Amino acid sequence: MQIKEIFMIRCISCLSVVLLHIISMVLMLQAEALADISHTVDSFRTLLMFSTPAFIFISEFLLARSYPDGVPDGFLKKRGKVIFVPFLFIAAIDALLMTSAMGGEVTFLAFVQKYLANVFLGNFIGYFILVIFQFYMLHMMFHEYLKKASPKWVLSISFVVTAAYLGYFSAASPAPASEEGGAFPFFWVPFAGWLFYFCLAYYCGKEYKRFLALLNQYRWVVYGAAIASGALVVTVSYVGEIGMISSKRPDIMLYSTSMIFLCFHLFSKMKHVPKIMMFISNYSFSIYLLHAYFMIIGYVLLLNMPEIPAVPAVLLLFAVCTAGPIMTSWALNKFKYGYLFVGKIYQPKQKKVTVEVRDHAG
């Protein structure tokens, strides 16, 4: 069967991440011109924060749906080739670019330090892959327990753990990702900050049909929760003490969950996935992993176009940072081992009128 909701959510999530980062860059470069609406822009940026949790949620959802009784032999080896090896390569590229951008001579020691921080601490855009691999390990170790345990208890406990974890570090480490300050600057990588999403995705994927039926039965609750949680995160962004624009906030956890439910409910009503959405979904991993580096091109473009208004600037960068990763991934995947550098392009297997999705859990 075709889990069309997955393709739609994956597409929307990766595009939302790109848009979020582009708006942040334009806001930084045009800070004076946009000063009067900066709060409004920040609120909109906050509303895009569901994207990374939703993208990561999909990985465990597909595992639970495809492998409820345990993953097949060679699972981690296969995932390592198509996901983790590209992660290591892009981590090296990022380390080289970031150490070069710091000015002065690029030393081997500085490169190694940044590379190790990228790989082990998730100190770059690819941190989400570390979270996904933790989900793989958790699924392999605990799927038997989760099958037997009460979902109400598991979800309740995991919700409290994740909310407490995010709440503490949101207060203790308010510094942005680029600033290594606070109690633990890379708190978003350990699974505790994502445990609720993992448990929720497991049960939603395992009981997919029942999950959709419940969403349909309580659809007005789903609509209301999305609106209420959206209003909450906007309010917190305006007046709350937890003012950082980040998906690693306890209120964002509520909002992201509501948006995931809303997307599953709405997209379950679709008869088919639009071709453009399917196309972008198939390249979503590469877009997510590579778009930040095409923003360097966008940065140079905007520096040479100081008079360009904010909206055209966002549209220009959005085109560059979406098309760039797609073309790069397409070109490298023409070579036998090109996927080892940028990830494999997902190609749904057609079986008459059905689409099998289990070979791409992330």
UniProtKB/Swiss-Prot annotation:
The lineage of its organism: Bacteria, Bacillati, Bacillota, Bacilli, Bacillales. This is Putative membrane-bound acyltransferase YfiQ. PANTHER family: O-ACETYLTRANSFERASE WECH. GO terms for cellular component: plasma membrane. It comes from Bacillus subtilis (strain 168). It is a multi-pass membrane protein. It comes from the Bacteria. Its EC number is 2.3.-.-. GO terms for biological process: enterobacterial common antigen biosynthetic process. The chain crosses the membrane at residues 11-31, 44-64, 82-102, 119-139, 153-173, 181-201, 220-240, 252-267, 283-303, 308-328. The gene is yfiQ. It is found in: Cell membrane.
